[in-house]
Amino acid sequence: LRDKILGTNSHVVVTNVTQTGMVDYETIMEKVVKVEGVKAAAPFILNQVMLAYGDNAVGVVVRGVDADREAGVSDLEKNLVQGSLKMLERPDKSSGKPRRDGIILGKELARRLGVQLEDAVSMVAPASRMTPMGLIPKIKLFLVVGFFESGMFEYDSNLAFISIHSAQKFFAMKGVVSGIEIRVEDI
């Protein structure tokens, strides 16, 4: 159980006390990785959204991750049963479908939504934007590029991953992250 929890999550999470996000996160990460006992650090964005496919809609937690750095702080890559973290940034164009940003879903979440690889799911943000027609929720289509199975039902049924760049754009957090994940040598 301990390994499953620590495999899906990093050992330490650093966030801004005001919860407005971290602006100078690259500089902070440079300092953090120099601390003795720290193996790796990676930025992340965390938010709640609704994912919809067909007649199915589910409230989930979405994590924006840096595909190149995430493997150093969690076992997400090892828990993938299909796809790869790199697909979050560059989905396969060979299908002939329009290129969309990628999303990786927990196996149970995918089952609940009824999606398969290369299906497009709608992500709906909790915050709305004002238009001449009134308040409209922010919606974006993401291409399902992979599935993970952590062995923890709560994670596998309520968690999705997108690239940190997609998350920054979708949540209007340009140059900002929710925090930094850290993996240490000895817990």
Question: Where is each model-derived feature located?
Answer:
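Short, intrinsically disordered, charge-balanced linker/junction segments flanking boundaries
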Residues: L1, G83-L88, E185-I187
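Membrane-interface junction motifs in transport/secretion proteins
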Residues: L1-I28
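A short beta-strand structural signal in non-transmembrane regions
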Residues: V12-N16, L109-A110, V176-I187
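Solvent-exposed loop/turn segments connecting transmembrane beta-strands
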Residues: T20-V23, Y53, I187
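A structural signal for hydrophobic secondary-structure junctions
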Residues: E26-G175
